[in-house]
């Protein structure tokens, strides 16, 4: 796993690197396409896909540039299929601090069912955890002991639920069902901020231990 932080609100773009010829899945290319391309070239990576945890503007800003340069498919939860096309839905038209709206073509592949999935050599499990956004999806790599969780959960916090389509109760229910039940040593890679573990969040995250509702 390799990551760079991009954009004004410091979004984490992840590069999941395989064993076969540096095949790489890019998760959430949020901004600064030139920096993402530089990371790919400097590390001799071979992109094979872009995967979105969700389609808020800060996670999709470099999507179209990267897709076109490397001619690779974009994978997405179909609940948010219109969000790449609509700056009102992805939030870029509603945020006065975003100078340009974020637009992209429709995704190439939609995750029609949650559960086990494969892209090339990569095997993982998907779970739908709405609440921050309607289509938020986490990607669990059980064999490798980590999960890419987007803006569902952070170190010491959880995703915003005051955005359109958000629900704090639904978000916490999903985290309790799909995140808290993972092995404690599972590393969580969030959309913003530092990695954490399931165990650390169970014991210290105020949104999970009842201190904050």
Which residues does each predicted region cover?
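Conserved beta-strand hairpin/beta-sheet module of binuclear metal-dependent hydrolase folds
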Residues: 1-43, 138-150
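Conserved S/T- and glycine-rich ATP-binding loop of Class I adenylate-forming
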Residues: 16, 53, 129
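Metallo-beta-lactamase
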Residues: 90-93, 122-213
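Residue-level detector of beta-strand structural context in well-folded domains
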Residues: 14, 109, 114-115, 137, ...
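Active-site HxH/HxHxD metal-binding segment of metal-dependent hydrolases
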Residues: 32-116, 122, 203-211
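A generic "binding-loop/recognition-motif" signal
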Residues: 9-10, 32, 56, 80, ...
């Amino acid at each position: 796993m390799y990551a760079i932080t991009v954009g004004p609100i410091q979004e984490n773009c992840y590069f999941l690197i395989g064993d076969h010829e540096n095949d790489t899945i890019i998760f959430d290319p949020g901004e600064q396409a030139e920096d993402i391309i530089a990371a790919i070239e400097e590390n001799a990576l071979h992109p094979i896909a872009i995967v979105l945890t969700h389609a808020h503007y800060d996670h999709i800003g470099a999507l179209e540039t990267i897709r076109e340069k490397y001619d690779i498919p974009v994978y997405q939860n179909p609940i948010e299929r219109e969000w790449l096309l609509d700056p009102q839905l992805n939030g870029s038209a509603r945020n006065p601090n975003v100078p340009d709206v974020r637009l992209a073509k429709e995704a190439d592949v939609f995750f029609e069912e949650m559960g086990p999935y494969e892209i090339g050599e990569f095997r993982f499990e998907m779970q739908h955890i709405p609440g921050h956004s309607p289509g938020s999806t986490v990607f669990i790599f059980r064999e490798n002991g980590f999960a890419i969780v987007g803006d569902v959960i952070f170190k010491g916090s959880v995703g915003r639920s005051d955005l359109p389509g958000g629900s704090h109760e639904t978000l916490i229910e999903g985290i309790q069902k799909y995140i808290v039940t993972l092995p404690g040593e599972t590393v969580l890679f969030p959309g913003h901020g530092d990695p954490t573990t399931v165990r650390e969040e169970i014991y210290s995250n105020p949104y999970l231990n009842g201190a904050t509702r």
